[in-house]
Regions:
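Charged catalytic and DNA/RNA-contacting regions of genome-maintenance
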Residues: 1-331, 340, 347, 351-360, ...
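Amphipathic alpha-helical transducer elements in NTP-driven molecular machines
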Residues: 2, 18, 29, 62-72, ...
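Short flexible coil/turn linkers enriched for glycine and charged/polar residues
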Residues: 11-13, 76-78, 119-121, 130-134, ...
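ATPase nucleotide-binding head domains, primarily ABC-like/P-loop NTPase cores
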Residues: 29-32, 230, 300-301, 311, ...
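Active-site phosphate-binding and catalytic loops of NTP-dependent enzymes
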Residues: 85, 108-117, 251, 389-393, ...
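Conserved catalytic alpha/beta cores of large enzymes that bind or transform nucleotide phosphates
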Residues: 165, 170-179, 184-187, 199, ...
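Amphipathic heptad-repeat alpha-helical coiled-coil/stalk segments that mediate oligomerization
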Residues: 202-217, 267-271, 283, 374-452, ...
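Intracellular alpha-helical coupling/juxtamembrane segments of multi-pass membrane proteins
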Residues: 322-325, 345, 349, 446, ...
Length: 860
């Protein structure tokens, strides 16, 4: 047996080998040591030589095969690959050693077991190809069969590859040697995305073989959509498919829907922008709560959740496609009863995509198939609800296939509550198969059958004392007393002589004995055979099931966006090609959702193609500059996925890319300081942005000396504003108040500030964006709010006055009087600030009434 193990292990050196022995998966040698450490398993040995030290014996450990999913999940999470070696021969019929073989290699990017997967997130394995002229990118989620591929050419090919990796965030990537040697690419994969990288030889990226593999998997029509002038798409996809076939040992028939997309179909976002805008997870905690996805995701199915995440990762650039989607959201907003009933109907559908994936793989159990049946049973009601809409995208979704024939097939075949394992039996429905029913009758009614046979033999022979008994030596027998042995028929075969009688057998009794004793094994084997046939038949309908699952997922997403729009009072934006960003009373979607009891101060925004193209925003820290800039970017993204936006009204011209330069930390591992990171990011932005891009730039130049920083900030601002160089719409937050002088001298530049009301040595943040530059920085006041000791704050004020006297001017030039915020806005801000600081639970009724009088007085 160990020789067989070593032969199989030799072919799977890079994986932990799960070697099936009876009801256990065993691991030996180094695999056992690793598994023992990672899985907290007891390390033992098969060597029985008591004289040999333990450290010289071959170590081993094992796990029950029925609990393997949880153990595999833990190993995969730690970055290991697991090769599963099964017994491919029935031990009962094997002559000598049982045949074994690898049935599948589980890697981080090829997981299909529910225990290893996150419901609302796709698990992609990527294929990357890079050379001197082009780059290819492909991803496949084998748990659902979804496959995407694209390719790039030119000097920016590697940058586009990086952005696609940030978009899909694969769990594993297979790469060609040139891609592996690309430092930024490898760093992104391993250090930031924590992606398992599999380096393949150059021989695995041969165009002719790649094209053949793609054609075999997807067909001629799909393969023909790949670009003829750029072989990188086929090379990356062909190598990826080859790797999947090699590790999964199956034809992957559910991987049959190829999405080839081109640059220009979707907004491109780099990893920095995705993280700064917190699209799918927060920057600090890496949690979904607090992200834009958390606000928008009210989906009822796992596949709907994954699709919504995909929409957020791939904002559209086509006005037609955006309007089509937002119109469907609008229909659901207007039809409250249909929307709410649809949400309820979707709630019980579950994860059809991944269920059908496990069915194709042959790993689905009876409970998985019944779960699919229960999901499909809800489809007629979903179709009925969608039929309320006879036009637009919802009208198209109403044409979904309800799969009633498959629901009926599963319902006729399987019982409603099958056992955990299909090897346990008792899951084929009664009446479906006559032989199963007969064997079950024998199995459950053995005593009754024997009693009936005994009565029949008594009547046939006339022997009143005849009885049928059983023992382990002879099995079933017929016992006749000596007084009646002369009446025994010739068909009886004497088996044993007793003092008081004789024991006989008959052929009929032996056949019945065989049936009774073997019924359990036979019925289990027959039920498993029938279940396997059912799985195979369902696998033949995989394309139908996937198409329906896709329609359900889209309906779920549209329903979610509509529910959020209604709950949060969003508006439907007008999306066009104007290039204008015009928002009336816009709000930050996440901030207001995280603080539902607080009053969010809305703000207007106008950014044109020529006038007001660049907004210089000044004001103290904590006043809300970053929140305001992010909310503009998030509303653009929301509009371009077809969502409503948090505003009273909005007109949003298509933005091709959103760039952010917000905050930084020293990248010590790369030997880069905060300032170097900042300058690198700014450089990347200025090289990649276009006049259709939106730039969010916060505190450019703060990581160096004042004059250096101010010079860089001004030069960057001039470059962004100049239509001959870039001319991109830019939100530029700064503490360099000298830059406000550029309004009026640099076309397209407009000054704004965050309104602040000073009351003695205290300040109130009004959170309102108003025209004009800030009159001062309020740095010392912010320091006081942060809790610096009074002595430090007092000393800082003295030093500030001294510096102002020495320089002959205040720390910042006062803003023009006409740009000051109105008294009403100030009063409103003071009221909001007072309410936020009030501990409501500690107020007496009289104190609460007094507070209301005070607040009302401020507003009147």
């Amino acid at each position: 047996m160990m020789k067989q193990y070593l032969q199989i292990k030799e072919q799977n050196q890079d994986a932990i080998l799960f070697f099936r022995l009876g009801d256990f998966y065993e691991m030996f040698g180094d695999d056992a040591r690793k598994a023992s450490k990672e899985l907290d398993l007891t390390l033992t040995t098969r060597d029985k030589d008591k004289n040999k030290p333990f450290e010289e014996k071959v170590p081993m450990c094992g796990i029950p095969y029925h609990a393997s999913d949880a153990y595999i999940a833990r190993l995969i999470a730690k970055g290991y690959k697991v090769a599963i070696c099964e017994q491919t021969q029935d031990p009962a019929t094997a002559k000598g050693l049982v045949d074994r073989d690898i049935i599948r290699v589980v890697t981080p990017g090829t997981v299909i077991d529910a225990a290893c997967l996150e419901e609302g997130r796709s698990n992609f394995c990527a294929g990357l190809y890079l050379d001197d002229t082009c780059a290819g990118f492909s991803v496949c989620d084998i748990s659902t069969g979804k496959t995407h591929v694209t390719a790039f050419q030119g000097p920016d090919r590697a940058e586009h590859l990086l952005n696609e990796l940030g978009r899909f965030s694969p769990a594993e990537a297979v790469v060609n040697p040139a891609a592996y040697q690309c430092g930024p690419l490898l760093s992104l994969l391993q250090d930031k995305l924590h992606c398992h990288v599999e380096r393949l030889s150059a021989g695995r990226f041969q165009l002719q073989e790649a094209e053949r593999t793609v054609r075999t998997q997807f067909g001629d029509e799909a393969a023909g959509r790949l670009p003829k002038g750029n072989p990188a798409a086929a090379l990356s996809l062909g190598a990826l498919l080859g790797y999947l076939h090699e590790t999964q040992k199956t034809d992957l028939r559910h991987v049959d829907d190829l999405d080839y997309y081109q640059q220009g179909q979707f907004m491109e976002l780099d990893l920095t922008a995705r993280r700064n805008l917190e699209l799918t997870e927060t920057l600090r905690s890496k949690e979904k709560k607090g992200s834009l996805l958390w606000v928008l995701d009210k989906t009822r199915t796992p596949m709907g959740g994954r699709l919504l995440r995909s929409w957020l990762e791939r904002p559209l650039l086509s006005v037609t496609a955006i309007t089509r989607r937002s119109a469907a959201v609008g229909q659901l907003v207007d039809h409250t009863m249909v929307r709410e009933e649809l949400a309820l109907a979707l709630s019980g559908i579950g994860d059809m995509e991944r269920l059908v994936g496990r069915i194709v793989y042959g790993t689905a159990g009876g409970r998985d198939v019944v779960a699919l049946k229960n999901a499909m049973a809800r489809l007629p009601h979903v179709k009925e609800l969608l039929s309320a809409f006879d036009r637009g995208r919802l009208g198209e979704l109403a044409q979904l296939d309800t799969l009633e024939d498959l629901t009926d097939l599963i319902g006729r075949t399987l019982c409603d509550d099958p056992p955990f394992s299909v090897r346990e039996g008792e899951f084929i429905r009664e009446g479906f198969d006559p032989e199963v029913d007969r064997l079950r009758g024998i199995l459950h009614g053995g005593k009754g059958i024997i009693a009936s046979m005994e009565a029949a033999e008594k009547e046939k022979t006339g022997i009143r004392t005849l009885k049928i008994g059983y023992n382990k030596v002879f099995g079933y027998y017929i016992e006749v007393s000596n007084s009646f042995k002369d009446q025994v028929p010739e068909t009886y075969i004497r088996k044993q002589t007793l003092v008081n009688g004789e024991r006989y057998i008959t052929q009929e009794l032996k056949d019945l004995e065989h049936d009774i004793l073997s019924a359990s094994d036979r019925v289990s084997a027959l039920e498993y055979e029938l279940f396997t046939r059912l799985r195979q038949e369902l696998s033949g309908h995989v394309a139908r099931i996937q198409a329906t699952a896709a329609a359900v997922a889209e309906a779920d997403c549209l329903c979610s966006l509509a529910a959020v729009a209604v709950k949060n009072n969003y508006c439907c934006p007008a999306v066009d090609e104007s290039g204008v960003i015009e928002i009336h009373q816009g709000r930050h979607p996440v901030v207001e959702a995280m603080r539902p009891d607080a009053l969010f101060v809305p703000n207007d925004t106008y950014m044109g193609c020529t006038q007001d193209r660049v907004s210089i925003i000044t004001g103290p820290n904590m006043a809300g500059k970053s929140t305001y800039m992010r909310q503009v970017a998030l509303m653009v993204l929301m509009a371009q996925i077809g969502s409503f936006v948090p505003a009273k009204a909005a007109r949003l011209g298509i933005v091709d890319r959103v760039f952010t330069r917000i905050g930084a930390s020293d990248d010590l591992s790369a030997g880069q300081s905060t300032f170097m990171v900042e300058m690198t990011e700014v450089s990347d932005i200025l090289h990649a942005a276009t006049d259709k891009s939106l730039l969010i730039l916060d505190e450019i130049g703060r990581g160096t000396s004042t004059f250096d920083g101010m010079s860089i900030a001004r030069a960057v601002l001039e470059y962004c504003a100049d239509p001959k160089r870039l001319g991109a719409k830019t939100l530029f937050a700064t503490h360099y108040h000298e830059l406000t002088a550029m309004e009026g001298t640099l076309p397209g530049v407009k000054n704004y500030n965050i309104a602040v009301r000073a009351r003695g040595e205290e300040i109130v943040f009004l959170r309102k964006i108003v025209p004009g530059g800030a009159d001062r920085s309020y740095g010392i006041e912010v320091a006081k709010l942060a809790g610096l000791p009074d002595a430090v704050v007092s000393r800082a004020r003295k030093i500030l006055r001294q510096l102002e006297e020495e320089s002959g001017r205040p720390a910042a030039a006062p803003a023009p009087r006409e740009d000051q915020v109105s008294f009403a806005a100030v009063a409103e801000g003071e009221v909001i600030d007072r309410l936020r600081r009030t501990q409501v639970d500690s107020l007496t009724p009289l104190e609460a009434l007094q507070l209301l009088y005070e607040l009302k007085k401020k507003l009147t």
